[in-house]
């Protein structure tokens, strides 16, 4: 009797569900280029995330994450995942002051995605919060 209860307790329903493949022919690529990292998120036109990648997830650590090369590798990875989901056409939205802005957009174009628009959506304050103090090196 005790053995049966143990065997039943060991059998749990599967937690992680298998990721379904979406067929999305056109979408949006959001490139967030900060001073420390670059994150590329590819969504469908409604804004639902299809796939994403970041310089940290691409294997870069520390100060190497903020390089243009890391942004290029990240954008290529995200574009490959998106093309596996059937994406062909993207609009690119670039946000942030980071070094990987242009290289990420170029990498998206080079992997075979058709870029129809590039928009800069960097938030600019109308004299809001005080910026961080200047670095003294």
Swiss-Prot record:
Domain of life assignment: Bacteria
Gene Ontology biological process: translation
A family per Pfam: Ribosomal_S11
Keyword Ribosomal protein: yes
Region (Disordered): 1-32
Keywords associated with the record: Ribonucleoprotein, Ribosomal protein, RNA-binding, rRNA-binding
Gene3D superfamilies, per database record: Ribosomal protein S11 (3.30.420.80)
Subunit structure: Part of the 30S ribosomal subunit. Interacts with proteins S7 and S18. Binds to IF-3.
Similarity comment: Belongs to the universal ribosomal protein uS11 family.
Entry-linked NCBIfam families: PRK05309.1, uS11_bact
Official protein name in the record: Small ribosomal subunit protein uS11
Source organism: Herpetosiphon aurantiacus (strain ATCC 23779 / DSM 785 / 114-95)
Lineage of the species this protein comes from: Bacteria, Bacillati, Chloroflexota, Chloroflexia, Herpetosiphonales
Gene name of the encoded protein: rpsK
């Amino acid at each position: 009797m005790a053995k049966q209860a143990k065997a039943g307790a060991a059998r749990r329903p599967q937690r992680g569900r298998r990721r379904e493949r979406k067929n999305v022919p056109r979408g949006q690529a959001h490139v967030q280029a900060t001073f420390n990292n670059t994150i590329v998120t590819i969504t469908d036109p409604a804004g639902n995330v299809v796939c994403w990648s970041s310089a940290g997830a691409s294997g870069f650590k520390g100060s190497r994450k903020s390089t243009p090369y890391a942004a290029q590798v990240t954008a290529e990875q995200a574009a490959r995942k998106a093309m596996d989901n059937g994406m062909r056409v993207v609009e690119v939205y670039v946000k942030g002051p980071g070094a990987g802005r242009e290289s990420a957009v170029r990498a998206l174009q080079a992997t075979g995605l058709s870029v129809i628009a590039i928009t800069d959506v960097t938030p600019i304050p109308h004299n809001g919060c005080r910026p961080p103090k200047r670095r003294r090196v």
